[in-house]
Amino acid sequence: MSIIPASVPAPVLPRRRQLLFGTMFVSAAVAMFEFSLVASYLAERAGKRNVWLTENSIPLTQPNMQFAALILGSIFVQWAVWAIARNERGQAYLALGCTAVMAAAFLNQTTFLWQRVGMTMAQAEGPFFYAVTGANFAFIALALGFILLMAFRALVGQPAAALFWHVNVALYAVVWLAVYIMK
């Protein structure tokens, strides 16, 4: 009689990290794209130094506050990673919400800055300014969408409660329309 079982169970495979590796590759591509835009901006500015920003000025208050919002967003998103690793869902949701608020603040400040600067595409610096800042705006917006997607993925453990909640919200929308709006 042998003490070794007839069949040994297969070992548990390590968790794959395709999302992490994919995000790393996309981040590298985004960085290369953004660096090329900044390089084009700097090359054009060096070539047209005497006419660059002669008609417009860019205030520093909004870019400084945008940077502060992004730094705070980085702190908050790291807090969310810490909370998710320790199964602290409440803290994770709070941290992701704070990150989303900081991203929204950044996007709001960017649009305010664009309006305040009032640069046109006909000016020498206009296309380059909007290409660099617009690409950054788009990537921060995509990051915000990614954060929100990850926040909803954390609800996977409670689908029945979430479904029940959403159905009741939809039912209240019908009641709201029929009873309070249409009277």
Tell me the role of every PLM-derived stretch:
Residues 1-183:
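...captures the hydrophobic TM-helix bundle architecture rather than a specific catalytic motif
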